[in-house]
Amino acid sequence: MESMYLILAKLPEAYAPFDPIVDVLPIIPIFFLLLAFVWQASVSFR
């Protein structure tokens, strides 16, 4: 059981290089929303 806690404790260090990606993730749905508007504008809101 202790080894499981050790693995969980080391995970943040393992994922440290991915921090910038995680910071950007919440913005992605907003980009999809904007993409939907751009797409509708390009087909002139049919």
Swiss-Prot record:
Presence of the UniProt keyword Transmembrane in the record: yes
Location relative to the cell: Plastid, Chloroplast thylakoid membrane
Organism ancestry: Eukaryota, Viridiplantae, Chlorophyta, core chlorophytes, Chlorophyceae
Name this polypeptide is given: Photosystem II reaction center protein K
Functional description taken from the UniProt entry: One of the components of the core complex of photosystem II (PSII). PSII is a light-driven water:plastoquinone oxidoreductase that uses light energy to abstract electrons from H(2)O, generating O(2) and a proton gradient subsequently used for ATP formation. It consists of a core antenna complex that captures photons, and an electron transfer chain that converts photonic excitation into a charge separation.
Classification via InterPro entries: PSII_PsbK, PSII_PsbK_sf
Domain of life from the UniProt record: Eukaryota
A single GO BP: photosynthesis
TM region positions: 21-41
UniProt record similarity statement: Belongs to the PsbK family.
Record's bilayer topology term: Single-pass membrane protein
